[in-house]
Protein backbone atom coordinates (compact mmCIF):
# COMPACT_ATOMS: atom_id res chain seq x y z
CA UNK A 1 0.00 0.00 0.00
CA UNK A 2 2.89 2.33 0.55
CA UNK A 3 4.35 1.39 -2.82
CA UNK A 4 1.75 3.10 -4.94
CA UNK A 5 3.90 6.10 -5.73
CA UNK A 6 6.60 4.01 -7.33
CA UNK A 7 6.15 4.19 -11.09
CA UNK A 8 6.85 1.06 -13.08
CA UNK A 9 7.00 2.79 -16.44
CA UNK A 10 9.60 5.12 -17.83
CA UNK A 11 8.72 7.94 -20.22
CA UNK A 12 9.91 7.56 -23.81
CA UNK A 13 11.99 10.67 -23.80
CA UNK A 14 13.85 9.86 -20.60
CA UNK A 15 14.48 6.14 -21.00
CA UNK A 16 16.59 4.44 -18.37
CA UNK A 17 19.48 2.58 -19.87
CA UNK A 18 18.59 -0.77 -18.33
CA UNK A 19 15.56 -3.02 -17.85
CA UNK A 20 13.23 -2.91 -14.89
CA UNK A 21 14.76 -5.10 -12.18
CA UNK A 22 13.05 -8.22 -10.82
CA UNK A 23 13.40 -7.10 -7.18
CA UNK A 24 12.20 -3.51 -7.51
CA UNK A 25 15.61 -2.45 -6.19
CA UNK A 26 17.75 -0.30 -8.45
CA UNK A 27 21.32 -1.14 -7.49
CA UNK A 28 22.08 0.98 -4.44
CA UNK A 29 18.57 2.42 -4.45
CA UNK A 30 16.93 -0.28 -2.31
CA UNK A 31 13.22 -0.71 -1.98
CA UNK A 32 12.00 -1.02 1.62
CA UNK A 33 8.61 -1.86 3.10
CA UNK A 34 7.04 -0.45 6.23
CA UNK A 35 8.19 -2.06 9.45
CA UNK A 36 4.78 -3.71 9.83
CA UNK A 37 5.16 -5.21 6.37
CA UNK A 38 8.58 -6.73 6.98
CA UNK A 39 8.44 -7.55 10.72
CA UNK A 40 7.23 -10.83 12.20
CA UNK A 41 6.13 -11.36 15.81
CA UNK A 42 8.27 -14.50 16.25
CA UNK A 43 11.49 -12.62 15.49
CA UNK A 44 13.39 -10.60 18.08
CA UNK A 45 16.72 -8.86 18.43
CA UNK A 46 17.15 -9.75 22.09
CA UNK A 47 17.10 -13.04 23.92
CA UNK A 48 14.48 -12.76 26.65
CA UNK A 49 13.92 -15.73 28.94
CA UNK A 50 10.43 -17.23 28.94
CA UNK A 51 8.59 -16.08 32.05
CA UNK A 52 8.13 -18.60 34.82
CA UNK A 53 4.65 -20.16 34.86
CA UNK A 54 2.14 -17.73 36.37
CA UNK A 55 -1.59 -17.37 36.73
CA UNK A 56 -2.89 -14.22 35.02
CA UNK A 57 -5.87 -12.29 36.31
CA UNK A 58 -7.03 -10.93 32.96
CA UNK A 59 -10.14 -13.08 32.85
CA UNK A 60 -12.30 -12.13 29.90
CA UNK A 61 -9.91 -9.29 29.10
CA UNK A 62 -7.22 -11.71 27.95
CA UNK A 63 -6.19 -11.16 24.34
CA UNK A 64 -7.31 -13.88 21.96
CA UNK A 65 -5.98 -12.55 18.65
CA UNK A 66 -2.23 -12.33 17.93
CA UNK A 67 -0.55 -9.05 18.87
CA UNK A 68 0.91 -8.42 15.39
CA UNK A 69 3.97 -6.60 16.64
CA UNK A 70 6.67 -6.28 14.00
CA UNK A 71 9.67 -8.21 15.31
CA UNK A 72 13.05 -7.78 13.66
CA UNK A 73 16.48 -9.18 14.40
CA UNK A 74 19.16 -6.59 15.09
CA UNK A 75 20.69 -6.67 11.57
CA UNK A 76 17.19 -6.43 10.06
CA UNK A 77 16.33 -3.44 12.24
CA UNK A 78 19.62 -1.78 11.35
CA UNK A 79 19.08 -2.31 7.64
CA UNK A 80 15.48 -1.08 7.81
CA UNK A 81 16.40 2.30 9.22
CA UNK A 82 19.57 2.70 7.16
CA UNK A 83 17.59 1.99 3.98
CA UNK A 84 14.90 4.51 4.96
CA UNK A 85 17.56 7.10 5.79
CA UNK A 86 19.00 6.67 2.30
CA UNK A 87 15.68 7.86 0.84
CA UNK A 88 16.00 11.01 2.89
CA UNK A 89 17.54 14.30 1.85
CA UNK A 90 19.07 16.63 4.41
CA UNK A 91 21.47 19.51 4.72
CA UNK A 92 24.27 16.97 5.17
CA UNK A 93 23.51 15.43 1.77
CA UNK A 94 23.14 18.56 -0.32
CA UNK A 95 21.98 22.14 -0.75
CA UNK A 96 18.63 22.57 1.00
CA UNK A 97 17.10 25.76 -0.43
CA UNK A 98 13.89 25.77 1.62
CA UNK A 99 13.06 29.47 1.84
CA UNK A 100 10.45 29.11 4.55
CA UNK A 101 12.87 27.54 7.01
CA UNK A 102 16.57 28.30 7.24
CA UNK A 103 18.46 25.05 6.75
CA UNK A 104 22.09 25.79 7.47
CA UNK A 105 25.03 23.59 8.26
CA UNK A 106 25.22 22.50 11.88
CA UNK A 107 28.95 22.52 12.65
CA UNK A 108 30.24 19.27 14.18
CA UNK A 109 31.89 21.31 16.91
CA UNK A 110 28.37 22.07 18.19
CA UNK A 111 27.70 18.35 18.43
CA UNK A 112 30.97 17.69 20.24
CA UNK A 113 30.14 20.33 22.84
CA UNK A 114 26.56 19.12 23.31
CA UNK A 115 27.88 15.62 24.02
CA UNK A 116 30.14 16.71 26.88
CA UNK A 117 28.89 14.65 29.85
CA UNK A 118 28.44 17.75 32.00
CA UNK A 119 25.79 18.96 29.55
CA UNK A 120 24.47 15.72 28.08
CA UNK A 121 24.06 13.62 31.23
CA UNK A 122 22.30 16.05 33.55
CA UNK A 123 18.63 15.92 34.49
CA UNK A 124 16.17 18.80 34.98
CA UNK A 125 15.22 17.51 38.43
CA UNK A 126 18.80 17.52 39.74
CA UNK A 127 19.44 19.95 42.62
CA UNK A 128 20.45 23.32 41.20
CA UNK A 129 23.66 23.22 43.23
CA UNK A 130 24.85 20.30 41.06
CA UNK A 131 24.28 22.01 37.68
CA UNK A 132 26.01 25.36 38.20
CA UNK A 133 27.93 24.92 34.95
CA UNK A 134 24.74 24.45 32.94
CA UNK A 135 23.15 27.49 34.58
CA UNK A 136 26.32 29.42 33.75
CA UNK A 137 26.00 28.40 30.11
CA UNK A 138 22.38 29.56 30.05
CA UNK A 139 23.42 32.89 31.54
CA UNK A 140 26.19 33.28 28.96
CA UNK A 141 23.77 32.43 26.12
CA UNK A 142 21.31 34.99 27.52
CA UNK A 143 24.05 37.63 27.65
CA UNK A 144 24.90 37.00 23.99
CA UNK A 145 21.24 37.14 22.90
CA UNK A 146 20.73 40.41 24.79
CA UNK A 147 23.95 41.89 23.40
CA UNK A 148 22.98 40.93 19.83
CA UNK A 149 19.49 42.42 20.16
CA UNK A 150 20.02 45.26 22.64
CA UNK A 151 16.95 44.07 24.56
CA UNK A 152 16.42 44.01 28.34
CA UNK A 153 15.39 40.46 29.21
CA UNK A 154 15.23 37.03 27.69
CA UNK A 155 12.98 34.04 28.33
CA UNK A 156 14.79 30.85 27.38
CA UNK A 157 12.00 28.34 27.97
CA UNK A 158 9.96 28.43 24.70
CA UNK A 159 10.57 25.29 22.67
CA UNK A 160 10.38 26.66 19.12
CA UNK A 161 9.48 29.72 17.06
CA UNK A 162 5.71 29.61 17.35
CA UNK A 163 5.99 28.77 21.06
CA UNK A 164 8.22 31.85 21.40
CA UNK A 165 5.60 33.95 19.62
CA UNK A 166 3.02 32.67 22.05
CA UNK A 167 5.27 33.58 24.98
CA UNK A 168 5.87 37.11 23.64
CA UNK A 169 2.18 37.68 22.96
CA UNK A 170 1.25 36.34 26.40
CA UNK A 171 3.71 38.84 27.90
CA UNK A 172 1.96 41.59 25.93
CA UNK A 173 -1.43 40.39 27.14
CA UNK A 174 -0.13 40.31 30.73
CA UNK A 175 1.25 43.84 30.37
CA UNK A 176 -2.08 45.18 29.13
CA UNK A 177 -3.90 43.39 31.96
CA UNK A 178 -1.50 44.90 34.51
CA UNK A 179 -2.09 48.31 32.99
CA UNK A 180 -5.84 47.91 33.14
CA UNK A 181 -6.66 48.00 29.44
CA UNK A 182 -6.57 44.26 28.82
CA UNK A 183 -10.29 43.98 28.07
CA UNK A 184 -10.43 47.02 25.83
CA UNK A 185 -7.56 45.90 23.64
CA UNK A 186 -8.71 42.78 21.82
CA UNK A 187 -7.30 43.28 18.33
CA UNK A 188 -3.86 42.37 16.96
CA UNK A 189 -2.64 43.79 13.65
CA UNK A 190 -0.85 41.35 11.35
CA UNK A 191 0.48 42.35 7.91
CA UNK A 192 -0.24 40.04 4.99
CA UNK A 193 3.49 39.46 4.59
CA UNK A 194 3.80 37.95 8.09
CA UNK A 195 4.48 34.34 8.88
CA UNK A 196 1.29 32.28 9.08
CA UNK A 197 1.99 31.47 12.70
CA UNK A 198 1.53 35.16 13.66
CA UNK A 199 -2.25 35.36 13.19
CA UNK A 200 -2.55 31.82 14.58
CA UNK A 201 -0.71 32.83 17.75
CA UNK A 202 -2.82 35.94 18.24
CA UNK A 203 -6.04 33.98 17.69
CA UNK A 204 -4.96 31.22 20.07
CA UNK A 205 -4.87 33.58 23.03
CA UNK A 206 -8.16 35.18 22.16
CA UNK A 207 -7.20 38.16 20.04
CA UNK A 208 -9.09 39.18 16.95
CA UNK A 209 -6.74 39.46 13.97
CA UNK A 210 -6.85 42.47 11.65
CA UNK A 211 -4.87 42.11 8.41
CA UNK A 212 -2.74 44.93 7.01
CA UNK A 213 -2.30 44.74 3.22
CA UNK A 214 1.17 45.05 1.73
CA UNK A 215 2.28 47.98 -0.43
CA UNK A 216 3.09 47.40 -4.10
CA UNK A 217 6.77 47.11 -3.15
CA UNK A 218 6.01 44.20 -0.82
CA UNK A 219 6.51 46.04 2.47
CA UNK A 220 4.19 47.45 5.12
CA UNK A 221 3.03 51.07 4.81
CA UNK A 222 3.22 52.97 8.13
CA UNK A 223 0.13 54.91 7.04
CA UNK A 224 -1.82 51.67 6.69
CA UNK A 225 -0.72 50.72 10.21
CA UNK A 226 -1.74 54.14 11.57
CA UNK A 227 -5.14 53.83 9.94
CA UNK A 228 -5.70 50.44 11.57
CA UNK A 229 -4.53 51.45 15.04
CA UNK A 230 -6.98 52.42 17.75
CA UNK A 231 -7.80 52.01 21.44
CA UNK A 232 -8.87 48.42 20.74
CA UNK A 233 -5.47 47.35 19.35
CA UNK A 234 -3.18 45.41 21.69
CA UNK A 235 -0.21 44.82 19.42
CA UNK A 236 1.25 44.67 15.93
CA UNK A 237 3.09 41.53 14.82
CA UNK A 238 5.63 42.21 12.09
CA UNK A 239 8.00 39.74 10.43
CA UNK A 240 11.26 41.48 9.57
CA UNK A 241 12.82 40.78 7.13
CA UNK A 242 9.41 39.78 5.83
CA UNK A 243 8.41 36.60 4.00
CA UNK A 244 9.10 38.24 0.63
CA UNK A 245 12.73 38.49 1.73
CA UNK A 246 12.51 42.28 2.11
CA UNK A 247 13.66 44.42 5.02
CA UNK A 248 10.84 46.57 6.39
CA UNK A 249 12.52 49.96 5.95
CA UNK A 250 9.79 51.90 7.72
CA UNK A 251 9.95 49.71 10.80
CA UNK A 252 10.94 52.58 13.13
CA UNK A 253 8.03 54.77 12.01
CA UNK A 254 5.72 51.77 12.38
CA UNK A 255 6.98 51.10 15.92
CA UNK A 256 6.50 54.74 16.89
CA UNK A 257 2.92 54.72 15.61
CA UNK A 258 2.20 51.49 17.49
CA UNK A 259 3.58 52.89 20.74
CA UNK A 260 1.77 56.21 20.31
CA UNK A 261 -1.48 54.25 20.13
CA UNK A 262 -0.68 52.46 23.38
CA UNK A 263 0.00 49.10 21.74
CA UNK A 264 3.08 46.86 21.81
CA UNK A 265 5.30 45.87 18.92
CA UNK A 266 5.98 42.15 18.43
CA UNK A 267 8.67 41.32 15.89
CA UNK A 268 8.82 37.84 14.39
CA UNK A 269 12.52 36.99 14.56
CA UNK A 270 12.46 33.85 12.41
CA UNK A 271 14.50 35.70 9.80
CA UNK A 272 16.95 37.18 12.31
CA UNK A 273 19.76 35.30 10.55
CA UNK A 274 19.62 37.91 7.77
CA UNK A 275 20.36 40.85 10.06
CA UNK A 276 22.41 39.28 12.85
CA UNK A 277 25.22 41.59 13.85
CA UNK A 278 23.89 44.28 11.49
CA UNK A 279 20.75 45.54 13.25
CA UNK A 280 20.11 45.98 16.97
CA UNK A 281 16.51 44.94 17.41
CA UNK A 282 15.98 47.32 20.35
CA UNK A 283 16.83 50.28 18.07
CA UNK A 284 13.79 49.40 15.95
CA UNK A 285 11.39 49.89 18.86
CA UNK A 286 10.63 46.20 19.32
CA UNK A 287 8.95 45.07 22.57
CA UNK A 288 9.24 41.32 22.05
CA UNK A 289 10.91 39.05 19.52
CA UNK A 290 11.52 35.32 19.40
CA UNK A 291 14.81 33.98 18.13
CA UNK A 292 14.91 30.57 16.47
CA UNK A 293 18.16 29.15 17.79
CA UNK A 294 17.61 26.30 15.35
CA UNK A 295 17.66 28.67 12.39
CA UNK A 296 19.86 31.62 13.21
CA UNK A 297 22.39 29.77 15.34
CA UNK A 298 22.55 26.57 13.31
CA UNK A 299 21.21 24.01 15.76
CA UNK A 300 19.61 21.07 13.91
CA UNK A 301 15.88 20.97 13.22
CA UNK A 302 13.35 19.83 10.65
CA UNK A 303 13.29 16.23 11.82
CA UNK A 304 16.91 16.47 12.87
CA UNK A 305 16.41 17.84 16.34
CA UNK A 306 14.25 19.91 18.62
CA UNK A 307 13.90 23.65 18.12
CA UNK A 308 14.40 26.38 20.67
CA UNK A 309 12.69 29.78 20.57
CA UNK A 310 13.95 32.13 23.28
CA UNK A 311 12.12 35.47 23.46
CA UNK A 312 13.83 38.79 24.07
CA UNK A 313 11.76 41.45 25.81
CA UNK A 314 11.85 45.22 26.23
CA UNK A 315 11.85 47.03 29.58
CA UNK A 316 8.07 47.28 29.46
CA UNK A 317 7.55 43.53 29.04
CA UNK A 318 10.53 42.18 31.01
CA UNK A 319 8.62 41.85 34.34
CA UNK A 320 6.17 39.42 32.70
CA UNK A 321 8.76 36.90 31.47
CA UNK A 322 7.78 33.31 32.32
CA UNK A 323 9.30 31.02 34.95
CA UNK A 324 11.65 29.22 35.33
CA UNK A 325 13.72 32.38 35.08
CA UNK A 326 17.44 32.66 35.60
CA UNK A 327 18.21 35.27 38.27
CA UNK A 328 21.64 36.38 39.48
CA UNK A 329 21.76 36.52 43.29
CA UNK A 330 24.46 36.98 45.90
CA UNK A 331 24.71 33.19 46.03
CA UNK A 332 25.20 32.93 42.29
CA UNK A 333 22.74 31.98 39.56
CA UNK A 334 19.35 30.68 40.63
CA UNK A 335 16.50 29.30 38.53
CA UNK A 336 13.36 30.88 40.00
CA UNK A 337 10.68 28.23 39.62
CA UNK A 338 7.56 29.89 41.01
CA UNK A 339 5.68 32.88 39.70
CA UNK A 340 5.32 35.50 42.37
CA UNK A 341 8.66 34.57 43.95
CA UNK A 342 11.50 37.05 44.26
CA UNK A 343 12.67 38.01 40.78
CA UNK A 344 9.46 36.76 39.12
CA UNK A 345 6.76 38.75 40.92
CA UNK A 346 4.73 39.42 37.74
CA UNK A 347 5.74 36.36 35.71
CA UNK A 348 3.07 35.27 33.22
CA UNK A 349 3.39 31.66 34.35
CA UNK A 350 5.17 28.74 32.81
CA UNK A 351 5.62 27.98 29.09
CA UNK A 352 7.14 24.55 29.60
CA UNK A 353 7.81 22.07 32.36
CA UNK A 354 11.50 22.86 32.68
CA UNK A 355 14.05 25.42 31.64
CA UNK A 356 14.06 24.87 27.86
CA UNK A 357 16.13 22.93 25.32
CA UNK A 358 19.49 22.56 27.03
CA UNK A 359 21.07 20.70 24.10
CA UNK A 360 20.17 23.56 21.77
CA UNK A 361 21.52 26.14 24.19
CA UNK A 362 24.90 24.42 24.12
CA UNK A 363 24.96 24.20 20.33
CA UNK A 364 23.86 27.81 19.82
CA UNK A 365 26.47 29.16 22.23
CA UNK A 366 29.13 26.98 20.59
CA UNK A 367 28.20 28.53 17.25
CA UNK A 368 28.33 32.06 18.66
CA UNK A 369 31.66 31.56 20.40
CA UNK A 370 33.29 29.84 17.44
CA UNK A 371 32.10 32.54 15.03
CA UNK A 372 32.76 35.56 17.21
CA UNK A 373 31.27 38.98 16.53
CA UNK A 374 32.95 39.30 13.13
CA UNK A 375 32.00 35.76 12.12
CA UNK A 376 28.34 36.21 13.01
CA UNK A 377 28.18 39.44 11.05
CA UNK A 378 29.82 37.73 8.09
CA UNK A 379 27.36 34.83 8.29
CA UNK A 380 24.48 37.33 7.77
CA UNK A 381 26.34 39.08 5.00
CA UNK A 382 27.16 35.84 3.21
CA UNK A 383 23.57 34.60 3.51
CA UNK A 384 22.29 37.84 1.96
CA UNK A 385 25.00 37.85 -0.71
CA UNK A 386 24.25 34.23 -1.68
CA UNK A 387 20.52 34.96 -2.04
CA UNK A 388 21.15 38.02 -4.18
CA UNK A 389 23.67 36.12 -6.29
CA UNK A 390 21.08 33.42 -7.03
CA UNK A 391 18.49 36.03 -7.89
CA UNK A 392 20.84 37.95 -10.19
CA UNK A 393 21.91 34.76 -11.97
CA UNK A 394 18.33 33.66 -12.69
CA UNK A 395 16.63 37.00 -13.39
CA UNK A 396 16.96 36.72 -17.17
CA UNK A 397 15.14 33.36 -17.29
CA UNK A 398 12.79 33.53 -14.31
CA UNK A 399 10.66 36.37 -12.97
CA UNK A 400 11.31 38.02 -9.61
CA UNK A 401 8.77 40.32 -7.94
CA UNK A 402 10.00 43.37 -6.00
CA UNK A 403 13.25 43.10 -7.98
CA UNK A 404 13.87 46.83 -7.88
CA UNK A 405 15.24 46.33 -4.37
CA UNK A 406 17.99 44.02 -3.22
CA UNK A 407 16.71 40.93 -1.42
CA UNK A 408 17.70 39.92 2.08
CA UNK A 409 18.44 36.26 2.76
CA UNK A 410 15.87 34.84 0.33
CA UNK A 411 15.50 34.97 -3.45
CA UNK A 412 11.83 35.12 -4.39
CA UNK A 413 10.45 34.25 -7.82
CA UNK A 414 6.89 34.15 -9.12
CA UNK A 415 5.44 32.05 -11.95
CA UNK A 416 5.08 34.77 -14.60
CA UNK A 417 8.01 33.23 -16.47
CA UNK A 418 6.07 29.96 -16.81
CA UNK A 419 3.18 31.62 -18.67
CA UNK A 420 2.40 29.71 -21.87
CA UNK A 421 4.54 26.69 -20.98
CA UNK A 422 1.64 24.71 -19.52
CA UNK A 423 3.75 24.12 -16.44
CA UNK A 424 3.32 25.22 -12.85
CA UNK A 425 5.56 26.03 -9.92
CA UNK A 426 4.89 22.54 -8.56
CA UNK A 427 6.20 20.94 -11.77
CA UNK A 428 9.45 22.90 -11.49
CA UNK A 429 9.85 21.83 -7.86
CA UNK A 430 9.34 18.18 -8.77
CA UNK A 431 11.83 18.38 -11.67
CA UNK A 432 14.37 19.85 -9.25
CA UNK A 433 14.14 16.63 -7.21
CA UNK A 434 15.29 14.66 -10.27
CA UNK A 435 18.28 16.99 -10.51
CA UNK A 436 19.29 15.99 -6.98
CA UNK A 437 18.04 18.99 -5.00
CA UNK A 438 15.43 19.38 -2.32
CA UNK A 439 12.84 21.79 -3.76
CA UNK A 440 12.62 25.39 -2.65
CA UNK A 441 9.54 26.56 -0.75
CA UNK A 442 6.62 26.75 -3.19
CA UNK A 443 3.34 28.73 -3.13
CA UNK A 444 4.53 30.77 -0.16
CA UNK A 445 4.40 33.67 0.53
CA UNK A 446 0.76 33.72 -0.51
CA UNK A 447 0.94 37.32 -1.73
CA UNK A 448 3.09 36.21 -4.68
CA UNK A 449 1.51 34.09 -7.43
CA UNK A 450 3.09 30.65 -7.77
CA UNK A 451 5.89 31.70 -5.44
CA UNK A 452 9.27 29.95 -5.40
CA UNK A 453 11.28 30.99 -2.37
CA UNK A 454 14.96 30.06 -2.26
CA UNK A 455 17.18 30.45 0.80
CA UNK A 456 20.74 29.26 0.24
CA UNK A 457 22.08 30.42 3.66
CA UNK A 458 25.75 31.14 4.26
CA UNK A 459 26.60 27.43 4.24
CA UNK A 460 27.10 27.09 0.48
CA UNK A 461 30.30 27.85 -1.42
CA UNK A 462 30.18 29.77 -4.68
CA UNK A 463 30.89 26.51 -6.53
CA UNK A 464 27.89 24.88 -4.87
CA UNK A 465 25.65 27.87 -5.65
CA UNK A 466 26.83 27.81 -9.29
CA UNK A 467 25.85 24.16 -9.67
CA UNK A 468 22.41 24.85 -8.21
CA UNK A 469 21.95 27.89 -10.44
CA UNK A 470 23.01 25.85 -13.49
CA UNK A 471 20.42 23.18 -12.66
CA UNK A 472 17.66 25.79 -12.38
CA UNK A 473 18.79 27.53 -15.57
CA UNK A 474 18.73 24.24 -17.49
CA UNK A 475 15.25 23.52 -16.15
CA UNK A 476 14.00 27.01 -17.02
CA UNK A 477 15.33 26.70 -20.57
CA UNK A 478 13.80 23.22 -20.92
CA UNK A 479 10.45 24.58 -19.72
CA UNK A 480 10.54 27.40 -22.25
CA UNK A 481 11.62 25.03 -25.03
CA UNK A 482 8.46 22.95 -24.52
CA UNK A 483 10.09 19.90 -22.89
CA UNK A 484 6.93 19.34 -20.85
CA UNK A 485 7.32 15.65 -20.18
CA UNK A 486 10.43 16.24 -18.12
CA UNK A 487 8.30 18.25 -15.71
CA UNK A 488 4.83 16.76 -15.77
CA UNK A 489 6.05 13.24 -14.93
CA UNK A 490 8.67 14.36 -12.40
CA UNK A 491 10.11 13.10 -10.21
CA UNK A 492 11.22 10.15 -12.35
CA UNK A 493 14.21 9.14 -10.24
CA UNK A 494 13.03 9.62 -6.67
CA UNK A 495 12.24 6.57 -4.51
CA UNK A 496 8.57 7.51 -5.02
CA UNK A 497 7.00 9.09 -8.08
CA UNK A 498 4.74 12.12 -7.81
CA UNK A 499 2.26 11.63 -4.99
CA UNK A 500 -1.42 12.44 -5.26
CA UNK A 501 -1.53 15.39 -2.86
CA UNK A 502 -5.25 15.93 -3.35
CA UNK A 503 -6.16 12.36 -2.46
CA UNK A 504 -3.68 12.36 0.40
CA UNK A 505 -5.45 15.39 1.88
CA UNK A 506 -9.03 14.38 1.09
CA UNK A 507 -8.72 10.75 2.14
CA UNK A 508 -5.61 10.49 4.28
CA UNK A 509 -4.43 7.05 5.37
CA UNK A 510 -3.19 7.81 8.85
CA UNK A 511 -2.67 4.29 10.08
CA UNK A 512 -1.32 1.09 8.62
CA UNK A 513 -3.97 -1.60 8.29
CA UNK A 514 -3.05 -5.20 7.83
CA UNK A 515 -4.11 -6.23 4.33
CA UNK A 516 -6.52 -8.93 5.50
CA UNK A 517 -7.52 -10.17 2.06
CA UNK A 518 -3.92 -10.74 1.06
CA UNK A 519 -3.24 -12.71 4.25
CA UNK A 520 -6.38 -14.81 3.79
CA UNK A 521 -5.59 -15.58 0.19
CA UNK A 522 -2.12 -16.76 1.09
CA UNK A 523 -3.37 -19.31 3.59
CA UNK B 1 -35.25 37.20 -11.31
CA UNK B 2 -32.11 35.69 -9.83
CA UNK B 3 -28.92 37.60 -10.13
CA UNK B 4 -25.44 36.74 -8.93
CA UNK B 5 -23.26 39.29 -7.22
CA UNK B 6 -19.58 39.06 -6.34
CA UNK B 7 -17.08 40.50 -3.89
CA UNK B 8 -13.52 41.49 -4.64
CA UNK B 9 -12.51 38.62 -2.35
CA UNK B 10 -14.15 36.26 -4.87
CA UNK B 11 -17.22 35.18 -2.94
CA UNK B 12 -20.51 35.08 -4.78
CA UNK B 13 -24.07 35.63 -3.60
CA UNK B 14 -27.18 34.41 -5.36
CA UNK B 15 -30.40 35.70 -3.89
CA UNK B 16 -33.24 33.19 -3.96
CA UNK B 17 -36.34 34.62 -2.31
CA UNK B 18 -35.37 35.92 1.10
CA UNK B 19 -32.22 33.84 1.41
CA UNK B 20 -28.85 34.30 -0.26
CA UNK B 21 -26.71 31.37 -1.40
CA UNK B 22 -23.03 32.03 -0.73
CA UNK B 23 -19.97 30.34 -2.18
CA UNK B 24 -16.66 31.07 -3.88
CA UNK B 25 -16.36 32.00 -7.53
CA UNK B 26 -15.02 29.85 -10.34
CA UNK B 27 -11.95 32.09 -10.45
CA UNK B 28 -11.36 31.51 -6.74
CA UNK B 29 -11.51 27.71 -7.04
CA UNK B 30 -9.12 27.83 -10.00
CA UNK B 31 -6.66 29.91 -8.00
CA UNK B 32 -6.91 27.66 -4.96
CA UNK B 33 -6.45 24.40 -6.84
CA UNK B 34 -7.90 21.16 -5.51
CA UNK B 35 -10.01 21.93 -2.44
CA UNK B 36 -9.43 19.35 0.28
CA UNK B 37 -11.37 20.69 3.26
CA UNK B 38 -14.14 23.17 3.98
CA UNK B 39 -15.01 24.44 7.45
CA UNK B 40 -18.57 25.72 7.55
CA UNK B 41 -20.21 27.93 10.17
CA UNK B 42 -22.82 26.65 12.57
CA UNK B 43 -26.45 27.17 11.66
CA UNK B 44 -27.78 30.18 13.51
CA UNK B 45 -24.46 32.03 13.47
CA UNK B 46 -24.86 35.72 12.76
CA UNK B 47 -22.29 37.05 10.31
CA UNK B 48 -21.50 40.60 9.33
CA UNK B 49 -20.48 41.74 5.87
CA UNK B 50 -16.73 41.26 5.48
CA UNK B 51 -16.43 39.08 8.58
CA UNK B 52 -15.06 35.56 8.55
CA UNK B 53 -17.73 33.02 7.70
CA UNK B 54 -15.95 29.84 6.58
CA UNK B 55 -12.53 28.42 5.81
CA UNK B 56 -11.52 26.70 2.59
CA UNK B 57 -8.38 24.64 2.39
CA UNK B 58 -6.71 23.51 -0.82
CA UNK B 59 -3.50 21.67 -1.60
CA UNK B 60 -1.88 25.09 -1.87
CA UNK B 61 -3.33 27.19 0.92
CA UNK B 62 -5.94 27.69 3.60
CA UNK B 63 -8.09 30.77 3.04
CA UNK B 64 -10.87 32.52 4.85
CA UNK B 65 -14.22 32.95 3.20
CA UNK B 66 -15.78 36.27 4.17
CA UNK B 67 -19.48 36.89 4.47
CA UNK B 68 -20.41 38.95 1.41
CA UNK B 69 -23.50 40.23 3.24
CA UNK B 70 -24.75 40.45 6.81
CA UNK B 71 -27.25 37.93 8.02
CA UNK B 72 -27.93 34.70 9.81
CA UNK B 73 -26.71 31.31 8.60
CA UNK B 74 -29.85 29.26 7.96
CA UNK B 75 -28.37 26.33 6.06
CA UNK B 76 -24.93 24.97 5.22
CA UNK B 77 -23.87 22.60 2.46
CA UNK B 78 -22.93 19.62 4.61
CA UNK B 79 -22.17 17.61 1.46
CA UNK B 80 -18.88 19.52 1.30
CA UNK B 81 -17.62 17.73 4.42
CA UNK B 82 -17.36 14.44 2.58
CA UNK B 83 -16.89 15.83 -0.92
CA UNK B 84 -14.89 19.08 -0.85
CA UNK B 85 -14.10 18.54 -4.54
CA UNK B 86 -17.61 19.84 -5.33
CA UNK B 87 -16.18 23.32 -4.84
CA UNK B 88 -13.88 22.70 -7.81
CA UNK B 89 -16.44 20.87 -9.94
CA UNK B 90 -19.36 23.26 -9.55
CA UNK B 91 -18.48 26.30 -7.40
CA UNK B 92 -21.71 28.11 -8.21
CA UNK B 93 -23.77 24.93 -8.25
CA UNK B 94 -23.39 21.95 -5.90
CA UNK B 95 -20.29 23.53 -4.37
CA UNK B 96 -22.17 26.28 -2.51
CA UNK B 97 -21.14 26.97 1.11
CA UNK B 98 -24.05 28.41 3.06
CA UNK B 99 -27.40 30.16 2.89
CA UNK B 100 -27.91 33.46 4.69
CA UNK B 101 -31.09 35.12 5.80
CA UNK B 102 -30.18 38.70 5.03
CA UNK B 103 -30.42 41.31 7.74
CA UNK B 104 -29.67 44.22 5.44
CA UNK B 105 -30.56 43.43 1.79
CA UNK B 106 -29.49 46.95 0.79
CA UNK B 107 -25.88 45.78 1.15
CA UNK B 108 -26.42 43.82 -2.05
CA UNK B 109 -26.06 47.02 -4.05
CA UNK B 110 -22.50 47.41 -2.81
CA UNK B 111 -21.42 44.17 -4.49
CA UNK B 112 -20.20 43.70 -8.06
CA UNK B 113 -22.55 42.44 -10.74
CA UNK B 114 -21.35 39.81 -13.18
CA UNK B 115 -20.01 42.37 -15.64
CA UNK B 116 -18.18 44.41 -13.05
CA UNK B 117 -16.68 41.25 -11.55
CA UNK B 118 -15.43 40.12 -14.96
CA UNK B 119 -13.85 43.53 -15.49
CA UNK B 120 -12.28 43.24 -12.05
CA UNK B 121 -10.82 39.81 -12.94
CA UNK B 122 -9.32 41.29 -16.09
CA UNK B 123 -7.37 43.75 -13.96
CA UNK B 124 -5.85 40.81 -12.04
CA UNK B 125 -4.58 38.95 -15.08
UniProtKB/Swiss-Prot annotation, chain B:
Q: Which BP terms from GO are recorded?
A: glycine decarboxylation via glycine cleavage system
Q: Which domain of life is it from?
A: Bacteria
What cofactors does this protein use?
Answer: (R)-lipoate
Listed InterPro entries:
2-oxoA_DH_lipoyl-BS, Biotin_lipoyl, GCV_H, GCV_H/Fam206, GCV_H_sub, Single_hybrid_motif
Residue positions, PTM N6-lipoyllysine: 60
Gene3D superfamilies from the xrefs?
A: 2.40.50.100
Q: A Gene Ontology CC term for this entry?
A: glycine cleavage complex
Keyword annotations for this protein, in alphabetical order, are: Lipoyl
Matching Pfam families: GCV_H
UniProt domain Lipoyl-binding: residue ranges: 19-101
Task: Reply yes or no: does the keyword Nuclease apply.
Answer: no
* Keyword Cell membrane in annotation: no
Q: How is the cofactor bound?
A: Binds 1 lipoyl cofactor covalently.
Report the sequence similarity comment from the record. Answer: Belongs to the GcvH family.
Q: How does it assemble?
A: The glycine cleavage system is composed of four proteins: P, T, L and H.
Protein's job: The glycine cleavage system catalyzes the degradation of glycine. The H protein shuttles the methylamine group of glycine from the P protein to the T protein.
The name under which this protein is listed is: Glycine cleavage system H protein
The species is Xanthobacter autotrophicus (strain ATCC BAA-1158 / Py2)
Which gene is the coding source of this polypeptide chain?
Answer: gcvH
